[in-house]
Amino acid sequence: MPNRAAWAEIDLGALAHNYREIRSRIQKGAKLCAVVKADAYGHGAIAAARVALDEGADYIAVATLSEALKLRAAGFTCPLLILGLVEPESAREVVDADITQTVCRMDLVEALSQEAVRQGKTVKVHLTIETGMGRIGVHPKDAAETAKQIAALPNVELEGVFSHFALADIPDKTFTKQQVKLFKEACDAIEAAGVHIPIKHIAESAAILEIPDVHIDMVRAGIIQYGLWPSD
């Protein structure tokens, strides 16, 4: 049988409607970050990011450096966050493309700092805290000291701090509440250490709809942009 291409037709008007619905549910003052990782979950990252920005998204987020560079190559100049880690050897590309990088290891932050100094630029980073997702991040008790070390480096702006919920999409919010507690304690410790971080974010798709108290400074809209519940 001959090979046949497969495609999906995306109603960008419906996508725009979804963004407006999401925006209407965000607490006043919170920024909207549209997550378009994995080619916007198969919907096309470039088209989805354009619609998101047209509908007032403040930030675009992806998972990898290659995804971020693809958007920059397409002409996007908006704030762009990589949610995953990169190797220190990729610092030049991150700084050169004005990408905001997630960090939790000092070797990466130091490489970004050195490259930013070399290029005469300031690189923005977001510190990720492991509160129960089991992925990447510093331990909550180490967050304040890590933030102090980052803030002391030249040409690095610690713009954000965040964490990921593990079970926010299920009815029982017991574990989610524990994650919120750990995140808040870590953020308070960072502030007490004299480091002010302007963008704190932990709310993702499920929390946008069900836990408005944790919208804080920014929310990350993922699968709900496309009309799906996170656990579907």
Question: Which stretches of residues belong to each language-model region?
Answer:
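Active-site loop/helix belt of alpha/beta enzymes
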Residues: 3-4, 38-55, 114-118, 131-232
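Non-cysteine beta-strand/loop elements that form the S-adenosyl-L-methionine
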Residues: 62-63, 81-87, 104, 123-130, ...
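Divalent metal-coordination and catalytic microenvironments
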Residues: 71, 127, 204
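Short, contiguous clusters of charged residues that form electrostatic/catalytic patches at enzyme active sites
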Residues: 13, 17-20, 107-110, 145, ...
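Short beta->alpha connector loops
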Residues: 65-66, 85-88, 106-109, 205-207
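A generic, well-ordered mixed alpha/beta core segment in the N-terminal half of proteins
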Residues: 97-133
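A charged N-terminal "starter" segment
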Residues: 1-100, 114, 122, 157
